[in-house]
Amino acid sequence: MKAVTPLESFTVPLGGQAVELQEIIHAEGGMAMLRVRIREGRRFTVFDIDQETARRWGETMAAWARRQPR
């Protein structure tokens, strides 16, 4: 069994995809992962990513957002 903690959910303004971010703690060993769930209509894309991947992905997205005009 694993523990699932919701972190954030939102809908993308252009495209309407529903995005959910969840922390997943696996019962065996207690490994923590970040689950990214993207729903487009009836289709789901799910990524379970480790800490290093989440850090790199987050930093890249934040850097891109800072470069965009407001």
Placement of each model-derived feature along the sequence:
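Positively charged, low-complexity terminal tracts
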Residues: 1-70
